[in-house]
Amino acid sequence: MTNIHPESPEDFEFIETPAASCTTPADDCGVRTTSYPAIKNAPVPADAAGSDSFSNTLLILLLVVIPWYTARQIGGGLKTTIFFAIFTTIPILMAFWSIASSISPRKNEKAKYAGRPVEHYLHFHSEHDRATYRGKSKIPMEVFYEKYFAGEVDFKMDALEALEFRHDWANFRFTMGLFKHFLFGFIPELLVHSRSQDEEQVRDHYDRGDDFYAWFLGPRMIYTSGIISDIKKEETLEQLQDNKLAVVCEKVGLKPGDTVLDLGCGWGTLAKYASVHYGAQVTGITLGRNQTAWGNKGLRAAGIDESQSRILCMDYRDAPRVPGGYKKITCLEMAEHVGVRHFGSFLAQVNEMLDDDGVFFLQIAGLRKSWQYEDLIWGLFMNKYIFPGADASTPLGFVVDKLEAAGFEIKGIDTIGVHYSATLWRWYRNWLGNGEKVKAKYGERWYRIWEYFLAYSTITSRQGGATCWQITLVKNINSTHRVEGINSQYGLTGAREAAIASVGKGSLPSAHVTFKA
């Protein structure tokens, strides 16, 4: 069944999310497995090697001793040591990471791998690759995905299913391709991260075509995590997103007439939801031209006049101010694109634009501090192919430190990584269901890149390699009336139930609105 989205400025269709394919039943893999309908359950939730066996002390020692010893052999002093260090640092780092990622033991061996040969999962097109990667001779994950995108290897089964058993056929050794991207792609972007770079990357990504995103995001057109309300049932993608919109509005204590600034508003779904159901006055900010047109059309179709709410196409640094500051500022998974270099100044700007009794809601993706090598390889893949420039995905401690330094007080934090996994699982199925249309317009390579991204991200967000946090904040000043925020100090479940009670008239308000009642 298909339907035309009433807000779309383009003529294309959405499909209903296809039913989940049958998951390979988990054998006795040594650890407990689950079977909740809400998520894609892991058949083998295994841990691999990571930070607990990585020696920073040894690495630093090598970085210091090798140039020092080399300089000493020729009678050199400090200046000679520094000179040699310029040439030895990168080779030492590359060799150390390559060796460590190859020989480090697993974090634990509680979970038993299925133990099937490489050829059970993968079909290589060249005789050389078939001879190289077979039996127990695993392929480095970075080498695999580059070959997969180039059409040199195929899965013999559903991509997500094969990736669930990736430890049978892939290793997580750091390769030359990873080092090349890290040194000549990731690091330069991290250091520069200019305004023009932001604009170029965002528009190249989000203005690719609304249909490209619609074919996995579905009718809500929301590119951020939804929220599960019941782990014992499979809610639709649209229900997950409606849950999230309600949670956001209740966590910030949204009231009629509140001025709201939504930074990185995407296609404007939150702006429309807050305008229709809560009577808020919303200004959405995005660099995407397509998103701006879509969002404004959606607001007008829902009966929201431009004098109440609007979507503006501009850099966040140029966001309009209002007298006294916005009552609410929301930022859902846009801050990662600000970059580490500008993260502190971005938060300072948000603080300056917020009313002294206002609320700031930040939903931000991040990585775990106790990393495993596959987390880092996944992160570099994401930076190269999916979100170039989004280098502010960090452990939670960094985010909290920057928020407090910018003058905020944390009111509440919820971790929603597994909710993201549930969302991604539905996006993945939508992508497969629209596969032929994607290939016809954008080509096999783009289809495969997003297939891999959505499948692997379903796994990594479920197992904690990458996660996402909802952080509710107020200004940390003496005149903030903290007592007035007690009634809206919700966790995820409480916020959803409050939305039903306050504006839902017994049921959760829907984001699918074409005319304001």
From Swiss-Prot:
Q: Keywords in UniProt for this one?
A: Glycoprotein, Lipid biosynthesis, Lipid metabolism, Membrane, Methyltransferase, S-adenosyl-L-methionine, Sphingolipid metabolism, Transferase, Transmembrane, Transmembrane helix, Virulence
User: Do you know which PANTHER family this protein is assigned to?
Assistant: SPHINGOLIPID C9-METHYLTRANSFERASE A-RELATED (PTHR45197:SF1), SYNTHASE, PUTATIVE (AFU_ORTHOLOGUE AFUA_7G04190)-RELATED (PTHR45197)
- Which reaction is this enzyme known to catalyze? a (4E,8E)-4-sphinga-4,8-dienine ceramide + S-adenosyl-L-methionine = a 9-methyl-(4E,8E)-sphinga-4,8-dienine ceramide + S-adenosyl-L-homocysteine + H(+)
Pfam family name, one? CMAS
In the record, biological process GO terms are: glucosylceramide biosynthetic process; methylation
Q: Does the keyword Lipid biosynthesis apply?
A: yes
User: Record-annotated residues binding S-adenosyl-L-methionine?
Assistant: 223-224, 286-291, 316-317
Enzyme type, top EC level: transferase
* Residues the record marks as carrying a glycan: 290, 478
One Gene Ontology molecular-function label: methyltransferase activity
Q: Which GO terms describe its cellular component?
A: membrane
What gene does the UniProt entry assign to this protein? smtA
Q: What is this protein called?
A: Sphingolipid C9-methyltransferase A
Give the enzyme's EC designation.
Answer: 2.1.1.317
